[in-house]
């Protein structure tokens, strides 16, 4: 007997078509799909169905990356499956180890790609192309996640519709094989914009907060997926070109989102941190997580989860990090973190910020102009203030504890503007331009900053005018400073721009080189040493900007592979670097061996 499961679109909007499956379940060898995709509206329904399957995988994807990274640790409430991820003892029985959730995405994409009539026209426009390209992009993204988690995986591009097809031997590919197989077709469509179905009403939470979904921002831009695959395979210039093309096409700047202490008086000449380590802050940085048609363009792609179980697929991430997004109660917790009293906090949270993360943030300088000063920029040991927003201190009863706020809205970010710019910095650095990478951290990538960016070498300016042409006459106006196109490090450190800030290329690089030397690295005064050190600086910035967003372990392993591919300190230097970062987790496996970075395949 055939068993067809109807696809449900996001937030419980059930499909009116029965021509595709969300979860492939069949009790015979007959094809259970209706291959006809000849209606123009089919594109929207199938695209939402594909994104529904992304929803079903996203919690696992976040937890695999964050539990195995260096920004989290377990506590007394942590469940066994999460503990096993954290100490690298997870077996195929671990509930978060499921390749199936990615192959479900892939098979849905394969079916759509195989059967969609891309020649359907409205006037002179091929109306099915944006959704077709979206299916290609999502499929490539899913394969990329599989390779990150499992190394070498089964690869197929035709839909599986029977038991015999499912059981047939499959071709095996690693990340390089995935790149070779999928990038050529993706490149044909890199200028195609994502589908846009307007704003979707997602209903209201159980405690009465309405939720709207910007449908354009739930899509995966093909250029960004391409850039990520190139970066994963150490093709740095190609990665940088993809990131630049997307930023240029969408005119995405590094916007001004900062955090500053609130004072009832003007900034003094000497700001001392409070002994408690907690600051009341003026917070513009968290505005970047607002998703609305009129909001900031920081969010590029996100996975919005349903407001309750009746409206679609829910997420367990807020609860694991300490927030009860699905409660029906209003908790008037005494919260010292500036959020409203209606926020619901969970003492029994299962994931803690690591001391490594706290130490990294606390070790940063905060830069400010004292009252009435035009040129003086001073330094205070306040630390990076993004931590004060990302990790909040909460008092509940007699217990004080920390919780992470990134998932309080029931959304999971895939791409932010800062994500793209930081990966661009990673690529530019490995191309041989650490000064260009530093510009993204310090000043923001803009031609109008050249007078201030005296650290840029002539060959770097030439590269940024020709190869990655931010500074070309054709593109320079797309990255102006009209809305303060500024460096990412300023989000948490404030005044990093310009020649008067203590945050300068030579000093920051020298500090990191000295740190590496203290760790026993044979540091010399060569361009290659500078590239390796700048890579560590970028890695630190990723920790502070993107903490707990579901990228960390993949970021660490990708960077470790960059280092292994560079002969500077030996072919296993990156693996040793990774193992040192994660040593505090007491992993049961030897992380100096790349094979131990991967999960067992079910």
Model-derived regions, located:
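Long, intrinsically disordered, low-complexity segments
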Residues: 20, 102, 210-214, 299, ...
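Membrane-proximal, proline-rich intrinsically disordered regions
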Residues: 20-72, 240, 577-602
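Conserved, well-structured interaction surfaces
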Residues: 39-46, 78-151, 166-180, 186-193, ...
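Short, surface-exposed recognition loops and adjoining beta-strand edges that mediate ligand/DNA contacts
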Residues: 61-69, 197-225, 232-324, 455-466, ...
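Elongated scaffold/linker segments in the mid-to-C-terminal portions of large proteins
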Residues: 47, 245, 252-451, 535, ...
């Amino acid at each position: 007997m055939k068993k067809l499961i109807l696809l449900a679109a996001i937030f419980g909007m059930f499909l009116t078509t029965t021509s595709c499956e969300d979860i492939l379940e069949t009790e015979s060898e007959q094809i259970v799909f209706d291959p006809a995709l000849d209606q123009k509206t089919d594109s929207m329904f199938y695209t939402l169905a594909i994104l529904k399957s992304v929803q079903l995988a996203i919690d696992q994807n976040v937890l695999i990356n964050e539990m195995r990274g260096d920004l989290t640790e377990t506590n007394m409430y942590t469940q066994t499956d999460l503990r096993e991820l954290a100490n690298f003892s997870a077996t195929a029985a671990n509930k978060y180890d499921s390749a199936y959730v990615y192959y479900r995405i892939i098979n849905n994409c394969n079916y759509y790609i195989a059967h969609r009539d891309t020649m359907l026209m409205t006037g002179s426009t091929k109306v099915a192309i944006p959704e077709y390209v979206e299916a290609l992009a999502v499929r490539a993204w899913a394969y990329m996640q599989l390779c990150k988690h499992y190394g070498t995986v089964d690869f197929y591009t035709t839909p599986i519709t029977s038991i015999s097809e499912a059981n047939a031997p499959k071709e095996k590919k690693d990340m390089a094989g995935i790149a070779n197989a999928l990038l050529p077709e993706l490149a044909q469509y890199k200028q195609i914009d994502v589908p846009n179905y307007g704003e979707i009403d997602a209903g209201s939470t159980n405690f009465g907060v309405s939720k709207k979904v910007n449908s354009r921002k739930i899509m995966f831009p093909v250029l960004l997926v391409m850039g990520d695959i190139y970066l994963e395979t150490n093709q740095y210039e190609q990665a940088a070109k993809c990131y630049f093309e997307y930023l240029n096409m969408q005119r995405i700047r590094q916007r001004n989102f900062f955090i500053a202490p609130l004072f009832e008086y003007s900034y003094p000449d000497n700001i001392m941190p409070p002994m408690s380590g907690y600051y009341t802050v003026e917070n513009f940085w968290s505005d970047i997580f607002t998703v609305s048609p009129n909001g900031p363009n920081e969010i590029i792609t996100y996975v919005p989860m349903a407001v309750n179980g009746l409206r679609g697929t829910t997420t367990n991430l807020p609860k694991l990090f300490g927030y009860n997004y699905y409660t029906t109660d209003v908790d008037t917790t005494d919260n010292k973190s500036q959020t409203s009293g209606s926020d619901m906090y969970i003492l029994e949270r299962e994931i803690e910020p690591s001391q490594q993360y706290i130490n990294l943030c606390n070790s940063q300088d905060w830069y400010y102009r004292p009252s009435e000063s035009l040129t003086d920029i001073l330094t205070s040991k306040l630390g990076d203030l993004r931590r004060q927003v990302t990790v909040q201190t909460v008092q509940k009863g007699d217990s004080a504890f920390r919780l992470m706020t990134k998932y309080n809205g029931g959304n999971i970010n895939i791409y932010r503007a800062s994500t793209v710019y930081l990966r661009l910095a990673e690529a530019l650095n490995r191309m041989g331009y650490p000064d260009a990478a530093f510009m993204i951290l310090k000043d923001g990538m803009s031609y109008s900053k050249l007078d201030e960016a005296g650290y840029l070498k002539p060959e770097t300016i030439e590269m940024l005018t020709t190869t990655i042409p931010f500074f070309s006459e054709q593109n320079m106006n797309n990255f102006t400073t009209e809305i303060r196109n500024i460096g990412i490090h300023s989000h948490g450190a404030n005044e990093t721009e310009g020649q008067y800030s203590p945050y300068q290329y030579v000093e920051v690089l020298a500090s990191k080189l000295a740190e590496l030397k203290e760790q026993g690295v044979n540091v010399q005064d060569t361009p290659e040493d500078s590239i390796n050190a700048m890579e560590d600086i970028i890695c630190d910035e990723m920790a502070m900007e993107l903490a707990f967003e579901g990228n960390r372990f993949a970021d660490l392993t990708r960077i470790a592979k960059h280092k292994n591919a560079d002969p500077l300190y030996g072919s296993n230097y990156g693996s040793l670097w990774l193992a040192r970062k994660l040593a505090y987790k007491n992993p049961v496996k030897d992380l100096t061996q790349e094979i131990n970075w991967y999960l067992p395949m079910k």
